[in-house]
Amino acid sequence: MTRTPVNVTVTGAAGQIGYALLFRIASGHLLGPDVPVNLRLLEIPQGLKAAEGTAMELDDCAFPLLRGIEITDDPNVGFAGANVALLVGARPRTKGMERGDLLAANGGIFKPQGKAINDHAADDIKVLVVGNPANTNALIAQAAAPDVPAERFTAMTRLDHNRAISQLAAKTGAAVSDIKKLTIWGNHSATQYPDIFHAEIAGKNAAETVNDEVWLADTFIPTVAKRGAAIIEARGASSAASAANAAIDHVHTWVNGTAEGDWTSMGIPSDGSYGVPEGIISSFPVTTKDGKYEIVQGLDINEFSRTRIDASVKELTEERDAVRELGLI
């Protein structure tokens, strides 16, 4: 195995999602079974000791693909030569915190990280923002990295995509592998819109197969959108393993391509498609090939969908305007 190792940086590496993520990256699930990796664990100073413990466990797994581990609290070191960056660490919303406070707190994290990526990452860097509010955090990081092509900054809506597939499979009795062309539109928030009008179940239109708009509006959409809160209620902690799995799926699909006859959902900088204002980072249906993605064009958007897409996009533009006022973009 003579391939050059790929440098993968994970922020918030000592957290729950980081813990669920790192072992799968090291075992080849992120990039492929023949791609060696160097891991960079980027943490805040008080997380370094826990990150060292995780690194010890990674060593103890003796993963053939894992060529090296570096732990740091300096973004300039953590992103040096990075080919893939998973920005997991973020400031969670605490009780009584206003959205503006949350955006400002995360601006203090993602703006310096974006600058470090701009100054030190490899030319082929691919960035996935997992830490919430993911879409707007990605926008903040991207704005701080003017020398990096904007399309290299993405936000994770793959967890919502996977949740929607699972709920649709449960409703119809189909296997998850039979479900194709599902779409998440908009923000990774309670306003997101999981769209089944173009989805297929074993080759048949999903909306026609379900044929139940009341279930769609009153059960399916809210269940997918509020699944994270339901998991916190049940588990006493936020979803970590499923979020890590979605991050793996997102990057793996971005690098290795979507299957023929299918697409995925990614939060990406809008080019104005489907009436989404240019520049905001919104989820779209995309196909990927050779490490690049393209928005699926020509989909007919009905009134049911249009209203919901517009509501989520409105929230994204409000978040963009808020971080602009804060001087973060």
UniProtKB/Swiss-Prot annotation:
NAD(+) binds at G12, A13, A14, G15, Q16, I17, G18, N106, Q113, V130, G131, N132. InterPro entries: L-lactate/malate_DH (IPR001557), Lactate/malate_DH_C (IPR022383), Lactate/malate_DH_N (IPR001236), Lactate_DH/Glyco_Ohase_4_C (IPR015955), Malate_DH_AS (IPR001252), Malate_DH_type2 (IPR010945), NAD(P)-bd_dom_sf (IPR036291). Substrate binds at R93, R99, N132, R163. The active site is at H188 (proton acceptor). GO terms for molecular function: L-malate dehydrogenase (NAD+) activity. The keyword NAD applies. Gene3D superfamilies: Lactate dehydrogenase/glycoside hydrolase, family 4, C-terminal, NAD(P)-binding Rossmann-like Domain. Pfam families: Ldh_1_C, Ldh_1_N. Its EC number is 1.1.1.37. Keywords: NAD, Oxidoreductase, Tricarboxylic acid cycle. It catalyses: (S)-malate + NAD(+) = oxaloacetate + NADH + H(+). Catalyzes the reversible oxidation of malate to oxaloacetate. PANTHER family: MALATE DEHYDROGENASE. Belongs to the LDH/MDH superfamily. MDH type 2 family. This is Malate dehydrogenase. It comes from Streptomyces griseus subsp. griseus (strain JCM 4626 / CBS 651.72 / NBRC 13350 / KCC S-0626 / ISP 5235). The lineage of its organism: Bacteria, Bacillati, Actinomycetota, Actinomycetes, Kitasatosporales.
